[in-house]
Amino acid sequence: MSEKEKKELTQECEELKEKYKELEEYAKRLKAEYENYREEVAREKRELIKNANEYLISKLIPVLDDFERALNQGEKGDAFYEGVKMIYKKLLNVLEKEGLTKIHVGEKFDPFEHEAVERVETEDVEEYTILEVVESGYKFHGKVLKPAKVKVAVKPRKKEERKVEEPSDKKE
């Protein structure tokens, strides 16, 4: 083998090594892009499922409200009442496993979680204290689907003496 042939083979070998490195880098990029694509598709799928669940659960909230109203009207100890209570608890348990949580009503009114349906003037408790829950509220994975409807304490309005001005007959 001549010196020229060796040089040509060495050059060809170097070119092939370079081409191999380029292809190897290209393959790594493709693999990374594919992994990112798979993760994106999986994330979108989870988001789609979450949104579908949120939609369905939001449609079931009025059913939970109806169960609560029925239980508030029923007589404890009655077999029918106990059956309705059992079904309500099962439904609520299933929905809670999917991410639904009842909004727990604390002492203070929170406009992000509560809807004031009545203002009760009183000095017995601190202003904006929740006096009564009219309807339960619900969250789904931290997002408020339905605010709790509550009665809120407010300070009594001071009755101010108002001066009533008589209309004047002057025309300018």
From Swiss-Prot:
InterPro entries per the UniProt record, alphabetical: GrpE (IPR000740), GrpE_coiled_coil (IPR013805), GrpE_head (IPR009012)
Entry-linked Pfam families: GrpE
Alphabetical GO biological process terms: protein folding
GO cellular component: cytoplasm
GO MF: adenyl-nucleotide exchange factor activity; protein homodimerization activity; protein-folding chaperone binding; unfolded protein binding
Record SUPFAM superfamilies: Coiled-coil domain of nucleotide exchange factor GrpE, Head domain of nucleotide exchange factor GrpE
The entry's keywords: Chaperone, Cytoplasm, Stress response
Location(s), subcellular: Cytoplasm
Protein task: Participates actively in the response to hyperosmotic and heat shock by preventing the aggregation of stress-denatured proteins, in association with DnaK and GrpE. It is the nucleotide exchange factor for DnaK and may function as a thermosensor. Unfolded proteins bind initially to DnaJ; upon interaction with the DnaJ-bound protein, DnaK hydrolyzes its bound ATP, resulting in the formation of a stable complex. GrpE releases ADP from DnaK; ATP binding to DnaK triggers the release of the substrate protein, thus completing the reaction cycle.
Entry protein name: Protein GrpE
Taxonomic source organism: Thermotoga maritima (strain ATCC 43589 / DSM 3109 / JCM 10099 / NBRC 100826 / MSB8)
